[in-house]
């Protein structure tokens, strides 16, 4: 496998320069800031109230257990909304211009059970730099359970992957929780990319918050009088719902019929295009005119915009989309968007089905 140092995007067509000029002009003309937006603060407040109201309902409402499980599902969707909107922006330094605020809000990923430190490395660096390049973009690897890239070796079980992947989504949050610990204490790298060393305080924080997670997910309900089966079922319903929502949304960004999977030259490591254009080639949007998805997804249905401007708060993405479309048209770059969530899901299904067949 080529090392990251050898992968080079060799073209400089001026696309990025023109795009940056247009986007900077938009913010200047309208007197807007890229981060620290009052409308984002309001959105955060609404989601936080939703999240804690759902949690309080699950723990304290005098309702029968099946209704409480419905509350667990609502809680899971609120957790997903917080992750998409607040945690994701913060970990990309797109929520605030104050890095300390971003770090504190970004650590909410840890309280969901996922290390924000490891996430920033594998997502911000590996995924956003080497999008859809097998062996470097961890998020298309699938840890051998699924085949997303045509460059990945085929095994027989993959022919059913378009079906069983939905079952895998259910267990992904628990996998993240455990795999973080394994990566830090044992493996120490993603593929050939060595994880930056943890400082002692960072390592203690990662492991300590994992223990704290066990406390409030399992210990608190037990202390309030719930039985062990009730706690296990409630936690499972919550995190399985969270897993299927989060994984589905992220899959609709790059694992589609219209998105490309890039292969560097085997000797030079060159990719004969501009990096910014490669982000558009490997990425697609969905349902960008739908108010619900625009609000709920935290800009993750505007993935093209997000990959080009990950440090800009997602509330600006709908306005930036037209700027990006215009520049793409000027440079002859195909801009990919699925008109509906259903259309993107169907494309993802067909791609997984195609990848499940032997080459």
Curated annotation (Swiss-Prot):
GO biological process: lipid metabolic process; unsaturated fatty acid biosynthetic process
Motif extent (Histidine box-2): 123-128
Catalytic activity: a 1-[(9Z,12Z)-octadecdienoyl]-2-acyl-glycerolipid + 2 reduced [2Fe-2S]-[ferredoxin] + O2 + 2 H(+) = a 1-[(6Z,9Z,12Z)-octadectrienoyl]-2-acyl-glycerolipid + 2 oxidized [2Fe-2S]-[ferredoxin] + 2 H2O
Domain of life: Bacteria
Subcellular location: Membrane
GO molecular function: acyl-CoA 6-desaturase activity; oxidoreductase activity, acting on paired donors, with oxidation of a pair of donors resulting in the reduction of molecular oxygen to two molecules of water
Main localization category: membrane
Enzyme nomenclature, EC number: 1.14.19.46
Name of the protein: sn-1 linoleoyl-lipid 6-desaturase
Recorded name of the encoding gene: desD
